[in-house]
């Protein structure tokens, strides 16, 4: 479809089919549309609200242009949509280390900060992890440690085509929805934190159509008007579980899993160096209990969707064991040490 045809269809309030959206996104990624046209398309899609077919079409386009990486298909991604503006520390990154210490393979897809002070890539760098490790070295890191961080700009170079337009628009677009569902390793097991509960059903349908094996979509309450793209230790958490082709809805409280109920302010983070120190303190057991509980909750769900735990309670036991035995701390140190060694090896090979 030509740019004008897509614009006219969206102006009239019509949805695009999966194929139309994939074709449209291909044109955007390949700079075949004008900047003004691309901006208008993104704004109109946002005003209308993206359908599952449109999201799947956009995903198909971006994934087809992504840099491939081969990891264990049982690996789990822990990520969130961002956008909650609560200023919490990097809960899902801390949880990834705890779960990995419990023997769960992790393939975390992430980026630098967009809506927060500190994205997953930022905090990993502050911990000493080189996020731009080439895919072949990342595969080796995963084989040695069971952990890989997939830095979005490295694996999705086509996204650069819209970076300036997105920044100039200054509004949420369909691209804000795509991060959690375009993991370049093609993971089938995920914990996805969703800031906007109105899009949870869209994510659920997209994940099922994309062949998800076991995933949990979570939206946490903070006890006030703010929401979290994390499971919450501040109030109830709404969950949509996707397992064996079924959609199951839950609402849970932190007390259901032996966790405390905390004020959102007790989960506050800061810049990348502050958040890196928080993660170290969680893993060595010296952090305030509120922060430990938040990381344990996300790790417990990660263990559950991995298949290693039969329920979240069992995932909690595995996660607590990972902390208490220092397996999580040892695993993080091993991951960073191995990452640095492989990065140095790659640098030496190019000199």
Swiss-Prot record:
Cofactor(s), names only, from the UniProt record: Mg(2+)
Regions annotated as coiled coil: none
Top-level taxon of origin: Bacteria
Subunit organization: Homodimer.
Protein name (record): Anthranilate phosphoribosyltransferase
Family per similarity comment: Belongs to the anthranilate phosphoribosyltransferase family.
Pathway assignment: Amino-acid biosynthesis; L-tryptophan biosynthesis; L-tryptophan from chorismate: step 2/5
Catalytic activity: N-(5-phospho-beta-D-ribosyl)anthranilate + diphosphate = 5-phospho-alpha-D-ribose 1-diphosphate + anthranilate
EC class: transferase
Main function: Catalyzes the transfer of the phosphoribosyl group of 5-phosphorylribose-1-pyrophosphate (PRPP) to anthranilate to yield N-(5'-phosphoribosyl)-anthranilate (PRA).
Binding-site positions, Mg(2+) 2: 229-230
GO MF assignments: anthranilate phosphoribosyltransferase activity; magnesium ion binding
Protein source organism: Chlorobaculum tepidum (strain ATCC 49652 / DSM 12025 / NBRC 103806 / TLS)
Cofactor note: Binds 2 magnesium ions per monomer.
A Pfam family per the record: Glycos_transf_3
EC number per UniProt: 2.4.2.18
């Amino acid at each position: 479809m030509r740019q004008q045809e897509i614009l006219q269809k969206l102006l009239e309030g019509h949805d695009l089919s999966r194929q139309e959206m994939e074709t449209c996104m291909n044109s955007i990624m390949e700079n075949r549309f004008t900047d003004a046209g691309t901006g208008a398309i993104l704004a109109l899609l946002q005003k209308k609200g993206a359908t599952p077919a449109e999201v799947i079409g956009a995903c198909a386009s971006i994934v087809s242009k992504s840099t491939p990486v081969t990891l264990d298909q049982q690996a789990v991604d822990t990520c969130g949509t961002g956008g909650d503006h609560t200023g919490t520390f990097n809960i899902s990154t801390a949880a990834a280390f705890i779960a990995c210490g419990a023997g769960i393979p992790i393939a975390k897809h992430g980026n630098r900060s967009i809506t927060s002070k500190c994205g997953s890539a930022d905090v990993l760098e502050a911990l000493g992890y080189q996020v731009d490790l080439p895919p072949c070295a990342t595969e080796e890191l995963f084989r040695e440690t069971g952990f890989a961080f997939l830095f979005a700009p490295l694996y999705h170079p086509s996204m650069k085509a819209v970076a300036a337009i997105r920044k100039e628009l200054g509004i949420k677009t369909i691209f804000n929805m795509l991060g959690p569902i375009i993991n370049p390793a093609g993971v089938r097991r995920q914990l996805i934190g969703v800031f906007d509960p109105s899009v949870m059903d869209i994510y659920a349908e997209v994940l099922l159509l994309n062949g998800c094996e076991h995933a949990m979509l979570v939206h946490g309450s903070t006890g006030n008007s703010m929401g979290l793209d994390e499971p919450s230790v501040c109030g109830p958490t709404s969950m949509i579980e996707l397992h064996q082709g079924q959609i199951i809805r839950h609402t849970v409280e932190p007390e259901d899993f032996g966790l405390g109920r905390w004020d959102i302010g007790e989960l506050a983070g800061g810049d990348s160096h502050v958040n890196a120190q928080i993660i170290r303190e969680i893993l060595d057991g010296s952090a305030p209990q509120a922060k430990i509980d938040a990381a344990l909750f996300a790790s417990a769900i990660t263990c559950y969707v991995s298949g290693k735990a039969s329920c979240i309670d069992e995932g909690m036991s595995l996660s607590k064991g990972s902390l208490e035995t220092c397996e999580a701390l040892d695993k993080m140190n091993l991951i960073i040490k191995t990452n640095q060694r492989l990065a140095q090896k790659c640098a030496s090979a190019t000199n």
